[in-house]
Amino acid sequence: MDLASRDSEAETVEQSSHSGAEQHSTKVLMLGALGVVYGDIGTSPIYAFREALHASPGIDTRAQVLGVLSLIVWALTIIVTIKYVAFVLRADNKGEGGTLSLMSLARTAYPKGARLILAIGLCGAALFFGDSIITPAISVLSAVEGLRVVTPTLDPYVVPITLLILAILFSVQRFGTGKVAAVFGPVTALWFLAIGVAGLYHLLDDPSILLAINPYYAVTYLASTPTAAFVTVGAVFLAVTGAEALYVDLGHFGRKPIVLAWFSVVFPCLLLNYFGQGAFVLANGGRPTNPFFQMLPDWALMPMVGLATAATVIASQAVISGAFSLTRQAVQLNLLPRIEVQHTSEMQLGQIYMPRINLLVALGVMLLVVGFGSSSSLASAYGISVTGEMLMTTILLFVVMRKLWKWRLAVALPLTLLFGIIDSGFFLANIVKIFEGGWVSITVACLMGLIMWTWIRGTRYLFDKTRRNEIPLDFLAANLLKKKPHLVPGTAVFLTSDPLSAPTALMHSLKHYKVLHEQNVILSVVTAPQPVVSDSDRVKMETVNDLFMRVTLTFGYMEQPNIPRALAICRKRGWKFDIMTTSFFLSRRSLKASPNSGMPVWQDRLFIGLARTAADATEYFQIPTGRVVEIGTQVAI
């Protein structure tokens, strides 16, 4: 009896310890999520309420203030709380989120609609790239503009200071964000606490502002002045920009910490600040130029400008990291050519740096800051890409609801229509700003969409053309077994995208050197529709005959391919792989445009240009350079 009670006590202590560790882990992840996930939406109060008020005509009346605030409250509730927190976050692809993850999930669930789903996914990804150059520009610029409230004499220095901060931000990317990321959470937590307290303090200026919780004021405002309200709706959307980050960063933190952080910290503090700004405007009358900073006491202005700048830099960092992550996914899914990837952490594989993407985003951001000069001007450019991306998410979510979750149409359709109508309304309200700055995000999105479409189309035509000219591997292997050429010791690995055909490098080797290795491996690398592939599913081996073997390596779209490490798994399957006796044969294609390619000449040239910029296969697949033999071939597409 005594032993049983001791065992019971020990079990209770163990369970308590496990529960405590789990709770601690959740709190740590919550803190991290505050910095990475909620940085963008958390800095929206700096400019969202101001822009929404300024979009409405004339002097701000009580009805206008309550109407605008009610629209913001219900936009946060329906789009973020209901759509993303309650539904979209459930659509994880093996724990990962984001447009391309959702696209892969939808394509797997509904193969018949694969092409249409791919097109929707491409649009969503292209729009994200448009967002990635606007977010750092408007966020940091809006924070530094707080200096104008401190003293108007600092106005000429706003743009130079913004450019300096952004230049430092992009220049330190190559060192990785691991060490700095440790302070992201605490700084952002302090930011939310500060904006919440500031809002709560001014809430007492006019407590009747809480009436804005009633959607009646939003509906009345929309109905009373439809034309002006339509423009205001486009500005109201600024309050929910960053909602997509909840889904994009799902794989970094998990659903539970993201949801808990939203309900316990982010949502309450955002509401308090927006209500505080509304009460401040009602109590003071007129039309404030910057209510977020103007409602602060003089002693708090400079500290808040500093904290706002830190918070917006963190928000920008999250978007830059997201651009790196999305680009890697696109490369793995063969939507873009290979791009150089540098790992900045030995512990966290997700922490990567892409020099070319970093440079392009930096140039885009700097040009926007110089060209537009103020966050108010940039606000017009901001909404289109984000609203478009959210609309793509809604469409893909419907496919997942119906085909993967097997929801009835009577349940899935009303929800999709609700989200779709709201997303479409915001999109249309922003599309009218296309000549005021919206053309920027549309141009970037169209350019990225064109690049991805050209790469997909070009690689498909190239694959079909080369396959028609290649000999079936089984036929060649059988003939070489009957009439063997001179055999040399060692193993030859031939990389190819088509494991059924004899690789070009193999044919050129036989033609010019008249020799064959004792063991020849036809190696192909494929990307799975899930983010990560376990080692047990990594390698597929197939013996063709005594001379040839097919090996297929599978990587998830979030993984960086490492061929030598993956081939080491083959030792457990019977193939004694030794890197020191293995030569890797790669075919380097020199492409030439052809009138019979199936694509217009301009697209041929664009595809050839993209192919030339592709990162070296040796480095990309992490093959030791001393073990590589490259054979050049010329191909007309």
Curated annotation (Swiss-Prot):
Q: Where is this region: Disordered?
A: 1-21
Which InterPro entries does the record match to this protein?
K+_transporter, K_trans_C, K_trans_N, Kup
Membrane topology summary: Multi-pass membrane protein
Q: GO CC: one term?
A: plasma membrane
Taxonomy, top ranks, is: Bacteria, Pseudomonadati, Pseudomonadota, Alphaproteobacteria, Hyphomicrobiales
Q: Which domain of life is it from?
A: Bacteria
Q: Where are the membrane-spanning stretches?
A: 29-49, 68-88, 116-136, 150-170, 180-200, 228-248, 258-278, 300-320, 359-379, 381-401, 409-429, 434-454
Would the keyword Cell membrane be found if you checked this record's keyword annotation?
yes
Keywords carried by this UniProt record: Cell inner membrane, Cell membrane, Ion transport, Membrane, Potassium, Potassium transport, Symport, Transmembrane, Transmembrane helix, Transport
Catalytic activity as recorded in UniProt: K(+)(in) + H(+)(in) = K(+)(out) + H(+)(out)
Localization terms from the record: Cell inner membrane
Family the entry assigns: Belongs to the HAK/KUP transporter (TC 2.A.72) family.
Q: Which GO terms describe its molecular function?
A: potassium ion transmembrane transporter activity; symporter activity
UniProt name for this protein: Probable potassium transport system protein Kup 2
Function recorded in the entry: Transport of potassium into the cell. Likely operates as a K(+):H(+) symporter.
Q: Which HAMAP family match?
A: Kup
